[in-house]
Regions:
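Short active-site segment of divalent metal-dependent hydrolases/proteases
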Residues: 127, 131-135
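Pseudouridine synthase
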Residues: 121-122, 129
């Protein structure tokens, strides 16, 4: 089911997050994750439309191979597909930011050794994917430090509403895609 996280009147100066759950491996609260995505985009001062989709293991593996070639025969946790190339859009037309695709089953598998809980892991992946849409990366140590600081800030402000829980870690598996 696809649904915007909040009603829209087509105003290009607002944030619209369209959410979809295309998997049945892990229960997903679309409104919760759509609201987190909206909060992050608003905090980053970005307007436009973002799609946030939750898919199964087979689908994310297929997307990874299709878009990144033979990058290993394993699923990843999150993929980001930016659409906005920085070109101006016509008046009255919202900017299409891109698509963030999260695999809750992979999040569930890696959560105990990473973020701690499944919810913390999914929250981190949503924020991580959005930051990639906005042009942030973690290819160098400096980029990684900046990206993790932004992730922590957004999670503290909009998800935990305070400090990170015990057991939360930013250390990611080496094979996890962006």
């Amino acid at each position: 089911m696809k649904e915007p996280s909040s009603p829209t009147d087509g105003n290009p100066n607002e944030v619209v997050v369209v959410t979809e759950n295309a998997q049945d491996e892990v229960e997903i609260d679309l409104a919760r994750w759509g609201a987190l995505a909206e909060d992050v985009l608003n905090a980053e001062g970005v307007t436009g439309e973002l799609t946030l989709t939750f898919v199964g293991v087979a689908d994310i593996r297929e997307l990874k191979i299709e878009h990144f070639g033979d990058a290993g025969d394993y699923p990843t946790d999150v993929l980001s597909f930016p659409l906005d190339d920085g070109m101006p859009v016509a008046d009255g037309i919202p900017r299409l930011l891109g698509d963030v695709v999260v695999c809750p089953a992979v999040a569930k598998e890696q959560a105990p050794s990473h973020a701690g809980s499944v919810d913390d892991e999914i929250a981190l992946l949503v924020v991580h994917g959005i930051l990639h849409i906005l042009g942030f990366d973690h290819a160098t140590a400096g980029e990684q430090t900046e990206m993790q600081a932004r992730e922590r800030k957004h999670l503290m402000n909009f998800f935990w509403h305070g400090e990170a829980p015990d057991g939360f870690s930013f250390d990611h598996r080496a094979e996890v895609g962006s």
